[in-house]
């Protein structure tokens, strides 16, 4: 009798079905399979958290992970666990989108923590394709900011449902009810549907892991948020019986398995080692590439868990496909149908990376050659599709690197610096476009939050940088929110000036808006540089007279070379300074005269400040230990001749 028992896939099963005896049983199996996968989909939610920088996205994910039981009782819990690299933790920003999953009751919730800075918006646009709804996180004091608008507009265009969470309601300067009005105005302004305007609203303190439906009475945990996700965000609407199809929305790179594709399965089922085909909607002439899914992973808490089979609606990662890019479609060989996707926004800012050729070249770096720098930049493009690296015409030691903004490129520079690379970079420059025969430049929507008595100064400074003043709104009784449309190049070097004008109390944020006709020449900075005229070691005597002419960037005992920028001066002209000048030795000494020389502590320049300070005739020397601003032409006489020739 055991030999007569039907076994799916067993010997003789095909004969059994062809004879008609197993048809009914096979149909029943297929029906049970569909019901089983439909039940799995009903217990699945895909959601992204979007907000502006430092509004608490990663902190909220931390709290969701803790309260869903991801951590063991004896496991050490790290704050902001989703910010996995040192730069993310130090700066308090998320750079690369992260995936995680929690289980609440019997429902699996895939959560994506997206970047909040506009420069990493290339990450956000792709991630929204993977989810069915979003959590819009807004600071109870700052309200919606430019990046909030940028991401929310794309989420609404995709028809996603929105859960509004007002965070940091325990801030002393919170203005909850004004922020609620601002969120509703933003939704109306972005043409949200009636259903989207009726979004549920919760009030939260992510730091304490508490939220509720009323700002006056919030609970002791995040249960209201979990319940709202289950009730309001729809389960994926997909077909598990159709041929396999998945759009690659994100990617990772591992030295052992190579490129890892991440995305949501749109339809069908995928098994380990299954044959697949890669195609692209925007490249229909491309020959489809055949591959094999050698490894499949689901997200579970903070980990990727290897699995044998995955079904439609789930967010997964897979390896085994060598050359794959964001926007590619992975599908079954018998149904090659590429999925449509919006191309990632093009870079707007470019810098030139080249071999360090200063007098101190090679002293501090581990990787200093053009080949090593080129290989590192090319590896970065495998992980960051918003980055573009191209050759510099006529040079074999320089590369043009284009990104979404100054922070995007500064993160790359800082990462390479920490890895031991030594190189030099040019000042950032905007990428111009020709539209209908007219030269156009990228424009930024700038929003600033400033003390009301500083508003006039800020408006005047932005106007001098060819910006347009769009709107002004009060924030309480002492602060104002100003909105501008300004050329991207008009913001180069402005942040330090802005902090000075607002006495350190201003907050500024910008996001790419559009391309507009070129607005003419614009000075990069309004101050001059103090430039070393000799090579050697700086001494107190040489710097003492220099500090009366401006602000120093270095102190005594620092190696300098001719052409190195050692400070700034209020005048627009550069001033040559001999920082190595020593006091002439004589037989006459006044008691205590040497002790009277006191230097003002030098201004410590961060990487972003150095990039903002750079003028067109300067470059930034980057080493693992030091940042040095220098003139392209080091010798003073040659530099003056070059200026006169112009």
Per-region residue spans from a language model:
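P-loop NTPase switch module centered on the Walker A-proximal segment
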Residues: 35-138, 142, 182, 251-254
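Residue-level signature of catalytic and energy-coupling elements of molecular machines
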Residues: 54, 60, 92, 111-113, ...
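Alpha-helical scaffold elements adjacent to nucleotide-binding pockets in ATP/GTP-utilizing enzyme cores
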Residues: 63-64, 101, 123-126, 130, ...
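Conserved Switch II/interswitch segment of TRAFAC-class P-loop GTPases
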Residues: 117-120, 129-149, 160-177
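Canonical P-loop GTPase G-domain recognition
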Residues: 172-230
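Accessory interaction regions appended to the cores of large information-processing enzymes
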Residues: 198-200, 220, 227-231, 258-261, ...
């Amino acid at each position: 009798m055991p030999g007569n028992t039907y076994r799916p896939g067993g010997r003789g099963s095909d004969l059994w079905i062809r004879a008609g005896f197993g048809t009914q049983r096979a149909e029943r199996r297929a029906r049970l399979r569909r019901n089983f996968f439909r039940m799995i989909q009903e217990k699945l939610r895909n959601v992204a958290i979007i907000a502006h920088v430092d509004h608490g996205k990663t902190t909220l994910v931390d709290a969701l992970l803790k309260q869903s039981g991801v951590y063991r009782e004896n496991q050490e819990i790290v704050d902001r666990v989703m910010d996995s690299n040192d730069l993310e933790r130090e700066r308090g920003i998320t750079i690369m989108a992260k995936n995680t999953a929690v289980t609440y009751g019997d429902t699996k919730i895939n959560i994506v923590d997206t970047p909040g800075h506009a420069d990493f918006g290339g990450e956000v646009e792709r991630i929204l394709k993977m989810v069915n709804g979003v959590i819009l996180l807004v600071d109870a004091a700052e309200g919606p900011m430019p990046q909030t608008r940028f991401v929310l507009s794309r989420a609404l265009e995709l028809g996603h449902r929105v859960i509004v969470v007002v965070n940091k309601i325990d801030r002393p300067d919170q203005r909850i009810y004004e922020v609620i009005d601002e969120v509703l105005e933003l939704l109306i302004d972005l043409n949200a549907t009636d259903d989207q305007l009726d979004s549920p609203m919760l009030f939260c303190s992510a730091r304490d892991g508490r939220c509720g439906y009323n700002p006056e009475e919030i609970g002791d945990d995040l249960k209201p948020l979990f319940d709202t996700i289950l009730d309001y965000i729809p389960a994926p609407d997909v077909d598990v019986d159709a041929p396999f199809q998945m759009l690659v929305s994100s990617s990772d790179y591992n030295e052992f398995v190579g490129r890892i594709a991440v995305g949501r399965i749109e339809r069908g089922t995928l098994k380990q080692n299954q044959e697949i085909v890669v195609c692209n909607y925007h490249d229909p002439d491309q020959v489809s590439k055949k591959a094999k899914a050698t490894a499949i992973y689901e997200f579970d808490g903070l980990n990727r868990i290897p699995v044998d089979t995955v079904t439609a609606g789930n967010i997964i990662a897979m390896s085994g496909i060598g050359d794959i890019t964001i926007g590619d479609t992975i599908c079954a060989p018998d149904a090659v149908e590429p999925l449509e996707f919006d191309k990632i926004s093009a870079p707007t800012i470019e810098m030139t990376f080249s071999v360090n050729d200063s007098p101190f070249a090679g002293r501090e770096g581990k990787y200093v050659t053009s080949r090593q720098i080129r290989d590192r930049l090319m590896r970065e493009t495998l992980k960051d599709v918003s980055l573009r690296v191209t050759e510099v015409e006529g040079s074999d030691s320089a590369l043009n690197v284009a990104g979404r903004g100054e922070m995007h490129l500064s993160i790359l520079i800082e990462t390479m610096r920490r890895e031991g690379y030594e190189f030099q970079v040019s000042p950032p420059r905007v990428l111009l476009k020709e539209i209908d025969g007219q030269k156009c430049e990228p424009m930024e929507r700038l929003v600033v939050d400033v003390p009301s008595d500083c508003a006039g100064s800020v408006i005047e400074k932005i106007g001098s940088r060819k910006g347009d003043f769009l709107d002004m709104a009060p924030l309480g009784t002492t602060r104002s929110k100003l909105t501008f449309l300004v050329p991207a190049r008009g913001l180069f070097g402005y942040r330090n000036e802005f902090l000075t004008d607002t006495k350190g109390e201003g907050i500024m944020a910008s996001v790419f808006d559009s391309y507009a006709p070129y607005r003419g020449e614009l000075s990069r900075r309004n101050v001059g540089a103090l430039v070393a005229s000799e090579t050697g070691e700086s001494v107190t005597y040489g710097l003492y007279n220099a500090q009366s002419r401006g602000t120093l960037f270095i102190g005594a005992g620092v190696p300098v070379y001719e052409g190195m920028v050692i400070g700034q001066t209020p005048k627009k002209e550069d001033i040559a300074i001999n920082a190595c000048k020593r006091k002439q030795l004589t037989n006459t000494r006044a008691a205590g005269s040497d002790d009277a020389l006191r230097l003002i502590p030098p201004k410590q320049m961060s990487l972003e400040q150095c990039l903002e300070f750079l003028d067109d005739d300067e470059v930034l020397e980057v080493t693992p230990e030091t940042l040095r601003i220098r003139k392209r032409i080091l010798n003073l006489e040659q530099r003056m001749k070059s200026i006169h020739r112009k």
